Amino acid sequence: MKTTAEIRQSFLDFFHTKGHQIVASSALVPENDPTLLFTNAGMNQFKDVFLGMDKRPYSRATTAQRCVRAGGKHNDLENVGYTARHHTFFEMLGNFSFGDYFKKDAIHFGWEYLTSPRWLGLPAEKLWVTVYETDDEAYDIWNKEVGVPAERIIRIGDNKGAPYASDNFWAMGDTGPCGPCTEIFYDHGEHIWGGPPGSPEEDGDRYIEIWNIVFMQFNRHADGTMEPLPKPSVDTGMGLERISAVLQHVNSNYEIDIFQKLIAKVAELTGEKDLSNKSLRVIADHIRSCAYLIADGVIPSNEGRGYVLRRIIRRAVRHGNLLGAKEAFFYKLVPTLIDVMAEAGIGVKEKQATVEKLLRLEEEQFARTLERGLALLDEALANVKKGELSGEVAFKLYDTYGFPLDLTADVCRERNITIDEVGFDREMEAQRLRAQSASQFGMDYNNVIRVEGCTTFEGYTASESLAKVTALFADGKPVERIEAGQSAVVILENTPFYAESGGQIGDSGYLNGQGFSFEVKDTQKYGQVFGHIGELVSGSLTVGKSVNAVVDVKRRHNTSLNHSATHLLHAALRQVLGEHVVQKGSLVSDVALRFDFAHHEAITKAQLVEIECLVNQQIRANHLIQTELMELEAAKAKGAMALFGEKYADQVRVLTMGDFSIELCGGIHAKRTGDIGLCKITTETAIAAGIRRIEAITGENAMSWLHQQQALLAQSADLLKSDVNSIVEKIQQLQDKAKKAEKELQVLKEKSAMQAGSDLARSAVKINDVSVIVQKLDGVDTKSLRVVVDDLKNQLSSAVIVFASVVEEKVNLIVGVTSDLTSKVKAGELVNLLAQQVGGKGGGRPDMAMAGGTQIENVDHALSFATTWLKENL
């Protein structure tokens, strides 16, 4: 029996013999593709190749790609654990042709690998295929060349309610590459229920799709239109876990070798004896996706990819709760996962400490609200009518207790109850509108600019170049000519302008020529071409004209200093805080630098000083900043850091600063570290769970900042009538005096209040032999009010005291009740009723309670209400 690791290797070996380049799996976070939450198919890393925007030194490739499907269009989360084949994390085996072979070879390759005794050796009679209804070419290849009988070839049309919406018309997302496909199914046999694809029983488990071969012919735009791709290509995908189940003679993916150890470990940690329990499957699946997402740089959060990760973690924790887990358990699966996936050929061992820590923190945080949330849900489900949980309750669970909707849906499904998702969405939208802030978006040219060829970048050695205009874009479309005052994007054949990348802003400057001048305000990269974004200041500009491209040198110089300082800062952070520190984002401009990084606790002042000193030490060392082009793998072997989320070519630019910093970087830098002059950290904050942010300035900006701080100190010293070195001592003296004066004032207030209390005791009215005082005492703070109430309770044997006070535009309410009356009048109940009259809330003990409010105009009404209520209840 072949192991999963052996199957993976045999697939790669087979296609290598067919002239395919073996390409490593890309990260789970797609590189430079905002249309995807996660890598969900093998072809994601080749999207730009299919679109003709990127070129590789090979035209055939094969991969074993790590994938996650738990958000967006491809979302398997709700099915995971309840079916035999759905996963959040899986591996997709694939072979790809970039304008090389097409349908004939793709089909023959697939059949040979599956049926040849040298490879998988599956019985041919066990295999069925489907083709797109109008794809006669694919049908004939299967039938006439491969020899699959017509009764085992099924045509599938548009079965999803729209043109090209079919099980046999594949698309990566709402936009992007797409085309007809042919799928290969394995027949498990008559002993398992189910029918062939296209039949009413197709959802059964007898016929299982094992391979999808996509004939990539089109690029779908946001408006639904499709244009032919430059060259027809092939994209195939075969789920490793599915084919392993077939070859290991089991009907469920959860019974294959890589899942058995994980399920056994979950059972051990939770004490579950029944190894068929679906919760074991859920947790075994989820630890794979969670660990690999964290290893690839995703941090649990409340938005985007981080929220999907949080949903998966919380779903796993809840299933652990179902199994009886009494303490944090999920993170304890990581060592077993590393062992299992190491056997399978991939691992997260290098990130083990970070993965375990984040999982443990997230689990412990959710555990604090899980029990209370489940109690609320149980109560709500007990009162459900018509078998549906209200959207309002589901939203409260989400908003207050951190229950993702799919977690609530899991609980409801176990009790055959549905959720009012329309109501939930309505509540979510209402919250979004409440929190919405205005935002402006400029013209997005990413899906508009499609230009043949590429722009040659000359900016490493030049700041001025002669260049030819190859294309113009204005108002979201290509044009041949622009006039003065018109905003546009200018594409050049060559350019000294740096296009925004790696956190560094794009260059600005001018494109000048005879009779015209174009101001470049930003530079962006669109595929292989550089777009110079700006406005034509004078004259007219047409495609084909020559321009003198001149970069704003001062702005670029300041930007380069900040970029070089960012590299030093990154290295210093790793040296002081630990090797777990990785870049999570950056912004390098001519004004300042911003650096986001993974770190799970606050940075101390001493650490921050050490980091800053280390950076400036390297600046003073005046290292030569060297760049070298080399192969990506050689650069990594040399120790160069490849930053998460960046897309690198096979040949990369390695930037070194002495022996202190070595990174892959395509940005513009200083010539020596000494050019930076000075680096000053201005702020350090947390921006999300596990993510910190440092902002800093360099060079002249840093000196200017220091001068401002020095002036501020001098001004403060003048106000304090002190010298600069004695400011802290002087402030401490003033604080001590202020505290002393405050205490003396409080004593006077309390004396005054007690005197007022004696007067108030004489004014008490009787209601059924109970002394009642209801008064407004303006300007009396809450502490003094408590003193007066306690004094009056001691003076009066049986009493209820109600005071209202307005201090600094806020209403303070206090109710005191002597112990003999708390069975009749509870201070907390009465003060809450009064608080409602003034737009507030409060609470406390039965004999003493306080509240606050904001509606000053209703104070008299509240006191009148108190008198009436006491007459009715005493």
From Swiss-Prot:
Zn(2+) binds at residues 563, 567, 665, 669. Its cofactor is Zn(2+). Its EC number is 6.1.1.7. GO terms for cellular component: cytosol. SMART domains: tRNA_SAD. One of its GO terms (biological process) is negative regulation of DNA-templated transcription. Gene3D superfamilies: 2.40.30.130, 3.10.310.40, 3.30.54.20, 6.10.250.550, Bira Bifunctional Protein, Domain 2, Threonyl-trna Synthetase, Chain A, domain 2. It catalyses: tRNA(Ala) + L-alanine + ATP = L-alanyl-tRNA(Ala) + AMP + diphosphate. Keywords: Aminoacyl-tRNA synthetase, ATP-binding, Cytoplasm, Ligase, Metal-binding, Nucleotide-binding, Protein biosynthesis, RNA-binding, tRNA-binding, Zinc. Belongs to the class-II aminoacyl-tRNA synthetase family. Consists of three domains; the N-terminal catalytic domain, the editing domain and the C-terminal C-Ala domain. The editing domain removes incorrectly charged amino acids, while the C-Ala domain, along with tRNA(Ala), serves as a bridge to cooperatively bring together the editing and aminoacylation centers thus stimulating deacylation of misacylated tRNAs. HAMAP family: Ala_tRNA_synth_B. Catalyzes the attachment of alanine to tRNA(Ala) in a two-step reaction: alanine is first activated by ATP to form Ala-AMP and then transferred to the acceptor end of tRNA(Ala). Also edits incorrectly charged Ser-tRNA(Ala) and Gly-tRNA(Ala) via its editing domain. This is Alanine--tRNA ligase. The lineage of its organism: Bacteria, Pseudomonadati, Pseudomonadota, Gammaproteobacteria, Pasteurellales.
